[in-house]
UniProtKB/Swiss-Prot annotation:
Residue numbers of N6-acetyllysine PTMs: 26, 57
Residue positions, PTM Phosphoserine: 28, 51, 85, 104, 134, 165
Phosphoprotein in keyword set: yes
Gene3D superfamilies associated with the record: HAD superfamily/HAD-like
Record field: compositional bias (Polar residues): 8-20
Name assigned to this protein: CTD small phosphatase-like protein 2
Residue ranges constituting the FCP1 homology domain according to the UniProt record: 282-441
Modified positions (Phosphothreonine) in chain numbering: 86
Enzyme class: hydrolase
BP terms from Gene Ontology: negative regulation of BMP signaling pathway; positive regulation of protein export from nucleus; protein export from nucleus
Pfam families associated with the record: NIF
EC number, UniProt record: 3.1.3.-
Keywords: Acetylation, Hydrolase, Phosphoprotein, Protein phosphatase
Length: 465
């Protein structure tokens, strides 16, 4: 007996078909329910619900999200406006980086200095960039060189010492004027020192032309004041103003002796300042000679001087200045002879950044000048810097100061020897004329103040009470 076997049907059973259709529908529901923004899918949504949501999304316009999606690094790098150093107050052009090439004074090579948001005028003068988004930097903190002395006005002539806020405003105005002034034509001569030594390999420049006003009024001042190196008769001292002169004219010309007469006394704090110099050693000379720098030993300018003995750069308030220096005739001979019998101390109202660099060039081994004092060691009175010799910590009976501005030693008038201001006279010999008198003071080995008082009679030039 044969049994018949039936082959399995190739068609799927209804149960399997139903299961497959159910699985396909489930997967399609999940795909439709996935949000486009990356949200998590909802498991409980049915096909009908997903269809409704799909219909709603397709019929409503898309709204911009408050927080836009993150952009890729490439997209962020393209937008340069995202990186700013100052608040954006409006649409402004991108900052331009101006590059200035300046000839190096040392080796003749070209050097580049980058200044942002500022245009550079000739020799360090700044011009504001109108496209800048940041406020312009100011350079009104003080001049590099010895500032011009300010006259006591009727409003502040009774001011106390140390009140330097009004003076800073006046000094700021002077800086602006000095940087805009153009110097007169200079006489062209060879760039050699008084003793014939050339400084062709030196380089620098700094010094605002704050002495331009002094140069113009030099003849007027010297006519009113007798020669400083010759004895002055008491009757030829202070002369009153002419009757026809107006009140305003009386205040136009700076009178150093009127300033000295009305200078306020030192405060207790200023009198008790700690000495700025170290104690003397056994090798230190017994007498001290304090020397001014500008217009006494040298003349410096920010304008190019064709007959300059040397020139060098100075960085001051992020601006590079080129300083041109003239050396007074017999400058080196004077220092070499005086350094053998005096403790030479340089005391200047100029900035240290300029004066210290200049002295490093003139006296690199400090064989001539033992100590250096700068503006920070002065006493500020109504914006004027006075050199109080008490800060030296030396015996004032054996201390001498030489300065072209008598008001600079207003507190120790009997210790001061005035000298004519020097700018460019090649025939000047004022330093040589002082050597015999200074040598005699050391030989006498006495209090120098009576001898200085009798020789120069500066007290007789003070105005009457």
């Amino acid at each position: 007996m044969k049994l018949r076997t039936r082959k399995a049907s190739q068609q799927s059973s209804p149960i399997q078909t139903q299961r497959t259709a159910r699985a396909k529908r489930k997967y399609s529901e999940v795909d439709d329910s996935l949000p486009s923004g990356g949200e998590k899918p909802s498991k409980n949504e049915t096909g009908l619900l997903s269809s409704i949501k799909k219909f709603i999304k397709g019929s409503t316009p898309k709204e911009e999200r408050e927080n836009p999606s993150k952009r890729s690094r490439i997209e962020r790098d393209i937008d340069n406006n995202l990186i700013t150093s100052t608040p954006r107050t409006g649409e402004k052009p991108d900052k331009q980086l101006s590059r200035v090439r300046r000839k190096s004074p040392v080796n003749g090579e070209a050097g580049s200095y980058e200044m942002t948001n500022q245009h550079i005028k000739q020799n360090g003068k700044l011009e504001d960039n109108p496209c800048s988004g940041s406020p312009p930097r100011t350079t009104l903190l003080g001049t590099i060189f010895s500032p011009v002395f300010n006259f006591f006005s009727p409003a502040n002539k009774n001011g106390t010492s140390g009140s330097d806020s009004p003076g800073q405003a006046v000094e700021a105005e002077e800086i602006v004027k000095q940087l805009d002034m153009e110097q007169v034509d200079e006489i062209t001569t060879s760039t050699t020192s008084a003793n014939g030594a050339a400084y062709s390999n030196q380089a620098v420049q700094v010094r605002p032309s704050l002495n331009n006003g002094l140069e113009e009024a030099e003849e007027t001042v010297t006519r009113d004041i007798p020669p400083l190196t010759a004895p002055v008769a008491p009757e030829s001292g202070y002369s009153s103003a002419h009757a026809e002169a107006t009140y305003e004219e009386d205040w136009e010309v700076f009178d150093p002796y009127y300033f000295i007469k009305h200078v306020p006394p030192l405060t207790e704090e200023q009198l008790n300042r700690k000495p700025a110099l170290p104690l003397k050693t056994r090798s230190t000379p017994e007498f001290s000679l304090v020397l001014d720098l500008d217009e006494t030993l040298v003349h410096c300018s920010l304008n190019e001087l064709e007959d300059a003995a040397l020139t060098f750069p100075v960085l001051f308030q992020d601006v590079i200045y080129q300083v041109y220096v003239r050396l007074r005739p017999f400058f080196r001979e004077f220092l070499e002879r005086m350094s053998q019998m005096y403790e030479i101390i340089l005391f200047t109202a100029s900035k240290k950044v300029y004066a210290d660099k200049l002295l490093n060039i003139l006296d690199p081994k400090k064989q001539l000048v033992r100590h250096r004092l700068f503006r920070e060691h002065c006493v500020c009175v109504q914006g004027n810097y006075i050199k109080d010799l008490n800060i030296l910590g030396r015996d004032l009976s054996k201390t001498i100061i030489i300065d072209n501005s008598p008001q600079a030693f207003a507190y120790q008038l009997s210790n001061g020897i005035p000298i004519e201001s020097w700018f460019m006279d090649k025939n000047d010999n004022e330093l040589l004329k002082l050597i015999p008198f200074l040598e005699k003071l050391v030989e006498l080995n006495e209090d120098v103040r009576p001898h200085i008082r009798d020789r120069f009679r500066l007290h007789d030039l003070l105005p009457p009470d």
